[in-house]
Amino acid sequence: MEIIKTVVELQTALLKIREQNKSIGFVPTMGALHRGHIELVKQSVVENTISIVSIFVNPTQFNDKNDLLKYPRTLNADCKLLLQETNNHFVFAPSVEEIYSETNIQQFKFGHLETVMEGKLRPGHFNGVAQVVSRLFKIVKPNCAYFGEKDFQQLTIIRTLVRLLNLNVKIIPHPTVREPNGLALSSRNIHLTPKQKKNAGMIFKTLSKSRKEKNILSIQELKQKTINKINCIPDFRVEYFDLVDGNTLQSITDWKDTKYIVGCIAVYIGEVRLIDNITY
């Protein structure tokens, strides 16, 4: 596995691969890799001739400078994990200057998609995500790019970005990877105490149980019941829970509004904020 830090180096390495019409799989990450990332990389390796993982802590998607400063930067450990667990070919670990070399930063408009849920609570976040992903796509020019379904709103934004820019890349979602108790894997989980981590499995268990009440309870009743159940757990506070159309992210008010219904939730456990989702 080769570690590359400049755009020129990467594009030189990929030139021969493209000339031979070999498929390139790409997994963009911010590092602090866990088993969820590893599963994405394994899929990329299996489905493509060459697999590339980018490790880049993107400053434009952080609303809080302290969050940016505190975000773990563990390149050596990440590369070691990739070597141990996957047959990945390249790691692209550029500097901020390498990615944002030009001063003109493109602004993206995603309309309703970026004004609800995570977008409402983190203004500008998805524009920052789009800025870095669009740049990485133009540098790597992958055939396929892999994203986890845990960040469902982000996945929807990325699909829209590809359409807006008319990019020739296939976006491949990967099911959320979970702990045995149902907790969705996240880099933030390391901040949970053992007791909090054990209780955190109740988020997905509660969502799963709520799915059985589809068409029995009204949308509003199901949302309120789910919120109340989770808020009853010590140290838990639901920030939002909404049932949305999986394509448009529009809130639904009736089970007949769409056949593709996704329940999206954000929960604080103490000071740790977790997100999850489930399809109804």
Curated annotation (Swiss-Prot):
Q: What does this protein do?
A: Catalyzes the condensation of pantoate with beta-alanine in an ATP-dependent reaction via a pantoyl-adenylate intermediate.
Pathway(s) it belongs to: Cofactor biosynthesis; (R)-pantothenate biosynthesis; (R)-pantothenate from (R)-pantoate and beta-alanine: step 1/1
Q: Name one GO cellular component term.
A: cytosol
Q: What is this protein's name?
A: Pantothenate synthetase
Gene that produces this protein: panC
According to its UniProt entry, one GO biological process term is: pantothenate biosynthetic process
Q: What class of enzyme is it?
A: ligase
The catalysed reaction is: (R)-pantoate + beta-alanine + ATP = (R)-pantothenate + AMP + diphosphate + H(+)
Spell out the coiled coil positions from the record. Answer: none
